[in-house]
Each structure stands twice: as structure tokens, then as C-alpha cells.
């Protein structure tokens, strides 16, 4: 069977050259006579892999020296707990901006550790927009402020990162890390599950300012303490070695594409193809405020569940798969991460045009 265009929100499409290299090296990595999956994480071979992955990420994101890159497990969902356990240490209070399902889950975990202030929310608008934050981030008696830069389920993103002067800004970038340029120095901590834009599931990356490490309460479990990973080069225990290896290959691929600025240009072109059609369509609609449309996750729907089901079935027959929207939103959703080629988006748009003609 030929490969399909996979529009899954995660685990998601990986670059074909990366998969081919994994296939080539699967049984015998670099002349070692063994697979990465069989290799000791203490070996010099793996030490070089994790170091190269860290260096590539630093280069691609222009990460300043005062930040650490940590390779973790547990997905972004575990970070919802790790962050307050490590950072909620002075005022026992944090600020959260609610922009979708994942930011709400992050807030709920933080509430188990300390006090949470909802700085702003777009829940009344069904998370179809990003709330205005002008003048709302002036409270200095917060240990940190948490945002989600891209809302995977709802299809919104921040156009401008909020300015927080004296409080660390923490960002969940799981679904748009490396898709567009960000000034890392604006953040105290950035975290992302790998399975959308970085690599396979099983790995989580945290980029954290060094002065935020080492302040966790003594009751913080060892494996939930950032200091544990910082002191041990992310090798305190066995890391998700295969996921780190594939992520390194994805970062190499991204560098070959011209880096983040080049991929951002391509991502804007890909999303414009789909948004331009949606804006002109008489059948398909997008619920998202146009000002805050995501480059990565694009929800859309037809007027009825019957048409949605028919659309999804016929799309699958054409090799356009995993387009069903999240159960909390319904309809369809096209996730067009870095690895999705322009041709995939163009084929989707072509099919949508045909479907509309058939269902006038």
C-alpha cells in the first residue's frame, strides 16, 4: 500500500527521509552491529546522540546559554504537574490563561499544588479566540504565568506572546514548537511533547532557564524534579532513547530545510491554501476567529453530521486520513505539521472543492 497523507494531531506525520534513515539504521546503527533500541544509554554512541539532539535544538531555536535543554518522559500532561511542583515555591500561586482543553487540564493539575489565578479566558467563546491580555499581567505576586501557544483541539494560536516582566512565562508549545520563530528569552520555561512536531511519542522536551532549577520543595519526587535531569544530563534513569534518536534525525532534517524561518514560511503557505478555500466555501466553515488561526491545526465542518461522515469516508478512500475532529469539537481537523508536504494540503483542498461541487 502507498503511504497516505496523515493529518493526525498526534502522533503525527514524520518526514519520509527520516523514516527511511531509521529503516536503514534499524538493525545496525553506525557499524555497532546493534539497533538503537538495544543500545545502552550509558554508551558513548548514545551520549553523542543526545548531545547532538540538544545542540541542534539550541541552534534551531537560538536558545541562550542560560537555558537547559532537558529530555523527559510522561508527555506534556506530566509537565502539568511538574511545573507547579518545581516553580510554585515563593507565593504558592500561579496565573493561567485559559485558551482550550489542554490549558484547562494544566490549570486543574496546578490547583492540586497551590493557588491558581485565571488571568484571562476564552471559554465563553468556546475557545474560538485568544483573550486580550492588555494590563492583566501586572500582578508580581505570582510564581509564574502559564500559556498554551497553540491550541491543538480548537485551532487557535497566540499572534503575539504576552509581555511578562518580572514573572517567569511558562509555555506549552507541544503542537507548534519549531513551526515558527519564537524569542526563547521571553520565556522562563518552554515544554513540548515530541509526537507532533519533534518526533515519535514517548519524549517530552523542556527548555528551562537555569535559575528556575533547584527550587522545588523537598517533598517533590525525584523523578518530577527538574534538578534531577539537569544534574544528570537527562540520564538519571533510562531515557526514551529511540524517541531521542528519531528526534535528532527530525532536527537534522529541519536544518536541511533551511531551519525554522524557512519552515515557518512553508507553514504559512500551507495554512493559507486551506484557509483561503474555507473563506470562499459555501459548504465548509471554520469556527475560529481569523485573527488567531493556528498554522498547525485547522478545524472545519459542514452543515450536518451526515455530510461530515461522508466527507471523512471518501477522504480516507483517497488516502487523506485522520481528519476527524476532536470529540469535544466535532467536524474535521487537518493537522499540518512541519512534515506535512505542500502536496498533501493541496490534495486535501482539491478534494474539498470536489466534495462541495457534489453537495451543492
From Swiss-Prot:
Binding locations of pyridoxal 5'-phosphate: 76-77, 102, 152, 172, 195, 237-238
Q: GO terms for CC?
A: cytoplasm
Give the chief site where it resides: cytoplasm
Q: Where does the record say this protein resides?
A: Cytoplasm
Pathway terms, separated by semicolons: Amino-acid biosynthesis; L-serine biosynthesis; L-serine from 3-phospho-D-glycerate: step 2/3
Q: Which residues carry this modification: N6-(pyridoxal phosphate)lysine?
A: 196
An example of a Gene Ontology BP annotation on this entry?
L-serine biosynthetic process
Named cofactor requirement(s): pyridoxal 5'-phosphate
EC numbers, comma separated: 2.6.1.52
The free-text note explaining how the cofactor binds reads: Binds 1 pyridoxal phosphate per subunit.
Ordered alphabetically, the record's keywords are: Amino-acid biosynthesis, Aminotransferase, Cytoplasm, Pyridoxal phosphate, Serine biosynthesis, Transferase
Top-level lineage group: Bacteria
Q: Name one GO molecular function term.
A: pyridoxal phosphate binding
The answer to whether keyword Amino-acid biosynthesis applies is yes
Q: CDD domains recorded for this chain?
A: PSAT_like (cd00611)
Catalysed reaction(s)?
Answer: O-phospho-L-serine + 2-oxoglutarate = 3-phosphooxypyruvate + L-glutamate; 4-(phosphooxy)-L-threonine + 2-oxoglutarate = (R)-3-hydroxy-2-oxo-4-phosphooxybutanoate + L-glutamate
The family note in this entry says: Belongs to the class-V pyridoxal-phosphate-dependent aminotransferase family. SerC subfamily.
- What does it do? Catalyzes the reversible conversion of 3-phosphohydroxypyruvate to phosphoserine and of 3-hydroxy-2-oxo-4-phosphonooxybutanoate to phosphohydroxythreonine.
Can you state the subunit structure given in the record? Homodimer.
Protein name in the entry:
Phosphoserine aminotransferase
